[in-house]
Amino acid sequence: MAHRWINDLTPADITPRGAWMNRRQVMAGMAGAGLAAFAGSAQAETLEPNSWEEITSYNNFYEFGTGKDDPAAYAHLLKTVPWSIKIDGMVERPGDYDFQDILSEMTIEERIYRFRCVEAWSMVIPWNGFELADLLAMAGVQEGAKYVAFETLYRPEEMPGTRYPVLEWPYREGLRLDEAMHPLTLMATGIYGKPLPNQNGAPLRLVVPWKYGFKSIKSIVRITLTDREPPASWNMAIPNEYGFYSNVNPEVNHPRWSQASERRIGGGLFAKRQPTLMFNGYEKEVAGLYQGMDLAKYF
């Protein structure tokens, strides 16, 4: 089921402008606005154009190395065909789901989302994909499930970064079930109308726009429904710095730097930092998920 969310960003806000400003893509990027059920609340200022190369070369994907340019340099080693996703745990129809079979059942739409890294840099990216809720509906969520766990591919011969104990491999992440079912939560299959590049998490990655980027796990091979909070790689490695929730919050700093502002990629060396928005600008849509919670404690 597609088009359940109104997009408040426009093609002028996308990074880079030149890769998107043609009629087909502009119309696709705006098509969901009149059909969605959710209204975006935050207004984004116009961003300076950025190059396609920056989007596909400035990445965190430690399976290929810890440098920002390592994923672009080494991700060509990754073989993404064939690809399947194991869906198990508390589901009615567990099994190995072929990626192409999943695509054939989904309506692919384009979502223009802000992307905020925990390292205090940001972009605006037009993703292609489908709502995670639709994939979970395909598998059938059992009563009593409370969380969704995700796992990245672990294939050292194709992912040279996994040869080093930077993290405990494979990379793992998790969401509460209500977060996973939220209409903003996307399973991305592409960007800018093209298939997802390897360095950006091909062929299938999670995008949760109100959370820091490391929650948006890449190259997913397993999804598990469970009644217990699942392990998450950065939370396991440094729990006092990376919480399970990791919602974008300018009022809760990382122990080693401020989260009150961010550096927009493509803004230039002397560009002014931008104030970070609560929940990355999606407060109206998602704040209700955390009503009554101490967001400094459950960071």
UniProtKB/Swiss-Prot annotation:
Keywords noted in UniProt: Metal-binding, Molybdenum, Oxidoreductase, Periplasm, Signal
Record's catalysed reaction(s): L-methionyl-[protein] + a quinone + H2O = L-methionyl-(S)-S-oxide-[protein] + a quinol; L-methionyl-[protein] + a quinone + H2O = L-methionyl-(R)-S-oxide-[protein] + a quinol
Cofactor(s) this protein cannot do without: Mo-molybdopterin
Top-level class of the enzyme under EC nomenclature: oxidoreductase
InterPro entries reported in the protein's UniProt record: MsrP, OxRdtase_Mopterin-bd_dom, OxRdtase_Mopterin-bd_sf, TAT_signal
GO cellular component: periplasmic space
Compartmental location: Periplasm
Signal peptide segment: 1-44
One GO-annotated biological process of the protein: protein repair
GO molecular function annotation: metal ion binding; molybdopterin cofactor binding; oxidoreductase activity, acting on a sulfur group of donors, quinone or similar compound as acceptor
Cofactor note (record): Binds 1 Mo-molybdopterin (Mo-MPT) cofactor per subunit.
Assembly and oligomerization: Heterodimer of a catalytic subunit (MsrP) and a heme-binding subunit (MsrQ).
Job description of the protein: Part of the MsrPQ system that repairs oxidized periplasmic proteins containing methionine sulfoxide residues (Met-O), using respiratory chain electrons. Thus protects these proteins from oxidative-stress damage caused by reactive species of oxygen and chlorine generated by the host defense mechanisms. MsrPQ is essential for the maintenance of envelope integrity under bleach stress, rescuing a wide series of structurally unrelated periplasmic proteins from methionine oxidation.
Name of the protein this chain belongs to: Protein-methionine-sulfoxide reductase catalytic subunit MsrP
Species of provenance: Ruegeria pomeroyi (strain ATCC 700808 / DSM 15171 / DSS-3) (Silicibacter pomeroyi)
Lineage: Bacteria, Pseudomonadati, Pseudomonadota, Alphaproteobacteria, Rhodobacterales
